[in-house]
Amino acid sequence: MQVNQPFYFASMKDSVEDKGTTDYLRLVAEKVGIESRHIDIEDIGLTSDGRFVDLEDRWIPHLFKLHAWEFIFHEPFGTAIAQCDTQFFEPAWKAILSNKGILPLLWEFNQGHPNLLASHLDTDPGKAVPKGWVRKPFFSREGANIELQTADG
């Protein structure tokens, strides 16, 4: 892959861990001769013609961001993603694969597969988690909002 323009790496301003990850990726990019820049996600701008820019109004041609697509879709600039000319590394369609709602579908079509756990859609999320079950929200990061009931309760 040939990258002739700056490659931006973005993370949330207050996430030290994500900044460390993007700094490492920037270092790798620089080692292979790709000019790279860091930008905080909160500092990415959008021009009137739908172009993503940095704080100096420079176009962001390539972007790797450590921020979930499902959050971006609901942010003010989320609607600009489909029409913009920024190349995202981790394309927006990956949000489908990161959605835990795909797990029951995989189980339905591949029941008993050794790499899958039995998964079902929760028809009553307000109800307590039964013994021996785990409840995961459709969108979850780093184990957040997971409910677990051991077999013993």
List PLM regions with ranges.
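Domain-scale recognition of functional cores that engage charged ligands
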Residues: 1-153
